Design a protein with these regions (language model features):
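Flexible, glycine- and charge-enriched loops at secondary-structure boundaries
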Residues: 45, 125-128, 156
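A general secondary-structure signal for short beta-strands and their flanking turns/coil
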Residues: 9-11, 98-100, 155
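Catalytic core of non-heme Fe(II) oxygenases with the double-stranded beta-helix
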Residues: 69, 74-145, 149
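Short, compositionally biased
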Residues: 151-157
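Non-heme Fe(II)/2-oxoglutarate
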Residues: 1-74, 82-84
Length: 157
C-alpha cells in the first residue's frame, strides 16, 4: 500500500531571532510604515526592512528549502478593536502572477490576532487563530483568506 500527498496547506510562524548586533529597530520600521501610509506611497527601502527581509528569506530557504521573492510590500495600522476586511492576496483571474505566500510581521503590536480560513477536504469553513506579537512572523499560502484583529482598546496596532 502506498500513500501520495496531493496537496497540503503549510503555515510557517515563529520569532525573528536576529544575530546579536543586528537587531531590527522596530520604531524606525514603524515610522517608515506610517510615513508611507500618510503620504500614500510605496513602502520605502530602509536598512531595517532590508535586514528583516534578508533574514526571513534566508531562514525560509535554509529551514524549509524554498526561496521567497517579494511581490508586494505594505503595512497596515489598525485602530483599537478594529477587525480587517476579509483579506485574500491573490488575483483569482491571474493566479500565475499572484504571490504564492503571504507573510505578516509584527512591528509594534499589542494583543493582535490573525484568523486564517481553510478547508480540509469535506470540512470547509475551518479556521486557525494565531497571535501576532512583536518581532514574530506568520507565513501562509496566499490562497487562504484571513482577518487581522486588534483585540485591545487602548492603542493602534
Amino acid at each position: 500500500m502506498e500513500k501520495k500527498v496531493l496537496a497540503e496547506i503549510a503555515l510557517y510562524y515563529g520569532d525573528v531571532a536576529m544575530p546579536k548586533g543586528f537587531e531590527i529597530n522596530r520604531d524606525k520600521l514603524q515610522s517608515d510604515l506610517l510615513k508611507s501610509q500618510i503620504n500614500n506611497k510605496e513602502f520605502p527601502y530602509s536598512r531595517e526592512w532590508d535586514m528583516l527581509n534578508t533574514y526571513l528569506r534566508e531562514h525560509i530557504n535554509v529551514e524549509h528549502g524554498f526561496q521567497l521573492i517579494n511581490k508586494k510590500i505594505w503595512g497596515n495600522v489598525y485602530k483599537p478593536k478594529e477587525i480587517s476586511v476579509p483579506l485574500l492576496n491573490i488575483d483569482p483571474v491571474d493566479l500565475r502572477n499572484s504571490p504564492d505566500y503571504t507573510l505578516l510581521y509584527g512591528v509594534n503590536v499589542k494583543d493582535c490576532s490573525v484568523k486564517i480560513h481553510y478547508a480540509a477536504n469535506r470540512r470547509a469553513g475551518r479556521s486557525w487563530d494565531i497571535a501576532l506579537t512583536n518581532n514574530k512572523f506568520i507565513m501562509f499560502p496566499s490562497t487562504q483568506m484571513y482577518y487581522i484583529t486588534n483585540n485591545q482598546k487602548d492603542s493602534l496596532n
